């Protein structure tokens, strides 16, 4: 029912930092925000994307929850000339495991969207929709057709899986699937 991005404070953090540092240097990123997507599969780690920007799709918000570092605040202060080394110190993480879960749905006219029931669950920090009631959701061909998202944290992977399922089912969504004539 969607894509997910999980962040855990796992032992391979140091190795990931070394990989990302090596990838940023050849593209000229030395200061400012930098974004990297990695695919970690067992002992294999590959770089998918490197960019001179903060990540989208709630990446910075998720990172703040599981690492304590507020990249949005730091980048805003840097852009305004007010960033100091103290601003680069991470705060206290909310939880060791988190996820951005994107919500997808079949195409059709959106009748009802309500995220409040999911937001009432402990560990759900944000829940929202990219589309509005009355709009027609097109078939899923890219990330632009995602219906919405959930931003969640938990104390472990199993708890996060359960919370994610519960939050997805708590979303009040009604879509009138339209048939082509």
Feature locations, PLM:
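Active-site "cap" helix and flanking loop/linker of ATP-utilizing ligase/carboxylase catalytic domains
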Residues: 15-36, 51-111
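Short, solvent-exposed beta-strand edge segments and adjacent coil->beta transition regions
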Residues: 2, 98, 145-149
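Generic C-terminus detector
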Residues: 131-181
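Conserved protein kinase catalytic/activation segment
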Residues: 43-46
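Glycine-rich active-site loop/lid that clamps phosphate-bearing ligands
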Residues: 102-133
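N-terminal low-complexity segments that are often proline-rich with Ser/Thr-Pro
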Residues: 7-15
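Glycine-rich phosphate-binding loop of ATP-grasp-fold ATP-dependent ligases
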Residues: 1-8, 59-62
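Conserved hydrophobic "DFG−1" position in protein kinase catalytic cores
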Residues: 38-40
